[in-house]
Amino acid sequence: IVYLSLSSSVGGANMNGHSIYTGKHGRGCEFGHMTIVPRGRKCYCNRAGCLDAYCCASILSDFTGGDLHAFFEEVKAGKNKGLINAFDEYMDYLAIAVHNLRMCYDCDVILGGYVGAYMSEHIETFRNKASELNPFEKDASYIKVCHYKTEASAVGAAVYYIDKFVKELGE
């Protein structure tokens, strides 16, 4: 399973069985710094075209004074074409990233973080965008929305220690 966190920055994790992939240098799953647009927007890492520069939460919330909830309420109301177009473009870039993750890992991708908490209402539209990019399958049901809408990383960290504790009880 790949978890893609769409919050103040973009990050993620890859669970393989009961193990989290961290990589050789502890930087595994730095999805926010995958290049999705060569020579694109400047990222806070001083490179250009990183996913973070296209899909962090502030890309959307900046349209509504930093209020992500207000952004999604406006999109839901359907009256502000500028916001609807901005969200459509956001989903286009996100679809590229999710497609790339699917091609690399061939597993489910969970959308989480601040933006992931709002994706339930838009998941079918988003799945359609992602499926258009995939040459092997049209079914994009592998894209999931997080169950925990807030504090997902805290829950994930706790689960690791709870699992470890339960295993120690069995020894």
Predicted feature descriptions by range:
Residues 47, 51-171:
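ATP-binding/phosphotransfer module of carbohydrate and carboxylate kinases, centering on a glycine-rich
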